[in-house]
Regions:
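Bacterial N-terminal signal peptides
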Residues: 14-27
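Beta-propeller domains with acidic blade repeats across secreted/periplasmic ectodomains
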Residues: 28-435
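N-terminal secretory signal peptides that target proteins for export/translocation
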Residues: 1-11
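Intrinsic-disorder-associated interaction segments
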Residues: 5, 15-18, 425
Length: 435
């Protein structure tokens, strides 16, 4: 999530004239909509302030005090939303002060409001990732990957969490294990940033036998309990997703923003060297465009960057594969642009043995400089859910720079579609295949 390395930027205004001039440039935009001049909006007001395409609306699912500091989320087989609250960020706390939590939300009456809320676990420290499956809940909280068993699915842990892996670094807490997602192969995938150095293994693993990672994507097999680095490189990724062919795509910050990721691939790095010193070269971005102007990001570039995507920092990666939105969005990758306070949309086109990525018009504008969508996922109803960290500061090097009093969950809905009720765990293999 760290996008500016120590600069506490507060975007309190925009150079509107420059935006209007530049709005016709890059990716065929007629004009950039009003940019985030608002700041510190109440939750319902923030939802109303957003600009979505025709036919779409933004629903407020939940907000403070029901949820604060949302840093990760996932859906379970009943369509419920699990959210990690990280109060420790950006610095790990003494154990006695740890109070990060895992919440379970549900919309029980289909009105696009999360009216049911449970606390599944609390007392976590620097929690940053979550996935539900295989009889429990998988949680990243450096230096550990944890598993909370809940075999009877009663929303109460069957016992204390098991430490599956340890050795996850926290030198830069913006860049530890994050963005958990189940891959089409059944492995649990996650991201890891370049300025945090991890030596991962099962508890008690000798230092010489541990797996090193400092930038890239890792994966863990939930049955065989195997851990490996899937790909190396990029910068501080907070988003990975798979298309309908099972191909992986990753977003990044500071360096070019989009990568088609293959097993064993070594990709452009923001800093440092690849572990193999004999690496001749690394794989570059598939993007044929940028979301920011200038050769090196600085505040002066903001007006120009607003016209072409908003900035160099991205969080989240969501390839739309639902059936509720217009067909032209299907298969495209959405990501949050942190400085631009908007969702970028990229088109992925097969090219040779890989892909190229081209920019579509920006999909959604928060019009609020405090908005920071950390994760975006498609729910069981085919609509997109966003968790919003919501803070005036986008870089959190100092502990007291973080506003821990708020957080929001939104849903982007097409044509006011109804919600759906699911319970995949109660279906047979044949019924699941039919879906």
């Amino acid at each position: 999530m760290n996008a500016c390395h120590g600069r506490d930027r507060k975007i309190l205004g925009r150079v509107i004239a420059a935006v209007l001039v530049l709005g016709s440039l890059a990716r065929g935009l007629d004009a950039a909509p009003p940019l985030p001049l608002a700041a510190g909006l109440a939750a319902a007001e923030a939802a109303r302030a957003m600009t979505a395409p025709p036919g779409f609306s933004v629903k407020l699912l939940a907000a403070e005090p029901e949820v604060c500091q949302p840093i990760a989320m996932c859906f379970d087989d009943r369509g419920r939303l699990w959210v990690v609250e990280c109060y420790a960020y950006p610095h790990k706390l003494p154990a006695a002060e740890a109070r990060d939590r895992i919440l379970i939300f549900e919309d029980t009456d289909g009105d696009h409001v999360l009216d049911s809320r449970k606390v599944f676990a609390e007392g976590l420290n620097l929690a940053s990732g979550i996935a539900v499956g295989f009889g429990g809940v998988w949680v990243g909280a450096a230096p550990e990957l944890l598993f909370f068993p809940d075999a009877d699915a009663d929303d109460v842990p069957d016992g204390p969490p098991r430490i599956l892996l340890d050795g996850w670094g926290a030198e830069d807490t913006h860049e530890t294990l994050n963005s958990f997602i189940w891959g089409p192969d059944g492995w649990l995938y996650g991201c890891h940033g370049v300025f945090t150095h991890s030596a991962v293994g099962k508890p008690g693993t000798p230092e010489s036998d541990r797996v090193r990672i400092n930038a890239g994507i890792w994966r863990y097999h939930p049955v065989r309990h195997e851990f490996e680095v899937f790909s190396e490189g990029t910068s501080n990724p907070w988003g990975v997703d798979f298309n309908d062919l099972g191909h992986a795509f990753q977003t990044a910050c500071v360096i070019p923003h989009l990568y088609h990721v293959i097993p064993g691939g070594r990709y452009q790095r923001q800093a440092g060297q690849h572990f193999n010193p004999s690496t001749f070269d690394d794989i570059k971005t598939i993007a044929r465009h940028r979301h920011w102007a200038g050769d090196r990001w600085n505040d002066a570039d903001q007006a120009a960057s607003d016209a072409i995507g908003g900035g160099h920092a991205h969080s989240g990666a969501c390839i739309y594969l639902g059936g509720a939105w217009p067909e032209h969005h299907r298969g495209k990758l959405f990501m949050n642009n942190i400085h631009g306070a908007r969702l970028n949309e990229d088109r992925l086109t097969p090219a040779g043995s890989g892909y190229v990525g081209d920019g579509e018009p920006d999909f959604l504008f928060a019009n609020d400089s405090w908005s920071q969508f950390i994760s975006l996922q498609v729910g069981p109803d085919g609509q997109m859910v966003l968790i919003d960290w919501y803070d005036q500061t986008q870089c959190h090097q100092q502990r007291d720079a973080v506003d821990r009093s708020n957080g929001r969950i939104f849903k982007v809905v097409y044509e006011n579609a109804a919600t759906v009720s699911v319970h995949l765990g109660g279906k047979s293999d044949g019924e699941l295949v039919a879906l």
